[in-house]
Amino acid sequence: MLRLDLQFFASKKGVGSTKNGRDSEAKRLGAKRADGQFVSGGSILYRQRGTKIYPGENVGRGGDDTLYAKVDGTVKFERFGRNRKKVSVYPVA
């Protein structure tokens, strides 16, 4: 009786895995309302991390530093100091 001793070798080289190739979802930060735009109370004006823009008149700051309107009115982005910015909402008379 004839026995064949066949050995099969890999046709492709074994490839290791990489730890790269992932990224987090974009957080959609930035201005949500434009200068001069009319907004209602509770509207989100600016989403940010930290205080890139400070709250001005009739604007509140949420727990995640989001700026929102406290009253109905017109949005105004302003500078104060040498290099700081703030956003205010002025009620329409």
Curated annotation (Swiss-Prot):
Claim: Ribosomal protein is one of the keywords in the record: yes
Classification via Pfam families: Ribosomal_L27
Propeptide position ranges: 1-9
Record bears the keyword Ribosomal protein: yes
Signal peptide boundaries: none
Keywords: Ribonucleoprotein, Ribosomal protein
Example of a GO MF term: structural constituent of ribosome
Post-translational changes noted in the entry: The N-terminus is cleaved by ribosomal processing cysteine protease Prp.
Disulfide bonds: none
Family the UniProt entry places it in: Belongs to the bacterial ribosomal protein bL27 family.
NCBIfam families assigned to the protein according to its UniProt record, in alphabetical order: L27
Name recorded for this polypeptide: Large ribosomal subunit protein bL27
